[in-house]
Amino acid sequence: EDLRNVTPPKVSLFEPSKAEIANKQKATLVCLARGFFPDHVELSWWVNGKEVHSGVSTDPQAYKESNYSYCLSSRLRVSATFWHNPRNHFRCQVQFHGLSEEDKWPEGSPKPVTQNISAEAWGRADCGITSASYHQGVLSATILYEILLGKATLYAVLVSGLVLMAMVKKKNS
């Protein structure tokens, strides 16, 4: 391998599609590490500071883009509810095994040593208002209003009856 071409990866994290969340109630985050050489990398997923393995699917090996460039992708699938919690923190970490201290490197440019490169995202809050939930809310509010109106009317009739009885009793005495 040509040590002059040693290059660390550029890591990107892509958030789940709204269509997948709506149709499948699942959320797939995609991590893409590109432009690295050589292909000595390890990719891991971290959620809320802990490494996770469940729901992870990583390419079996890095794909060669050109003579001195590789790429690797990985997916993390979680429930839509878990994704919609803004307290959840997702991180894709790529450990790049670059040059060792003994390897010669020209002075004046940064030496690509072994390092961790990450991309991260936070869960996205979803207000959850759909057409169906909006209509259900309007219906519930209407029913509640009618109950309160009926209760107020019943109270008014009851108070009026008591006042009328008190007036009749006072008139007769």
Curated annotation (Swiss-Prot):
InterPro entries associated with the record: Ig-like_dom, Ig-like_dom_sf, Ig-like_fold, Ig_C1-set, Immune_Resp_Modulators
Topology feature Cytoplasmic, residues: 169-173
UniProt key word Transmembrane helix: yes
Cellular compartments annotated: Membrane
Membrane topology: Single-pass membrane protein
Positions of glycan attachment: 67, 116
Primary location: membrane
Annotated keywords: Glycoprotein, Immunoglobulin domain, Membrane, Receptor, Transmembrane, Transmembrane helix
Keyword Glycoprotein found: yes
Note: Clone B10.A was isolated from a cytotoxic T lymphocyte. Clone 2C was isolated from a cytotoxic T lymphocyte.
Name listed for the protein in its UniProt record: T-cell receptor beta-2 chain C region
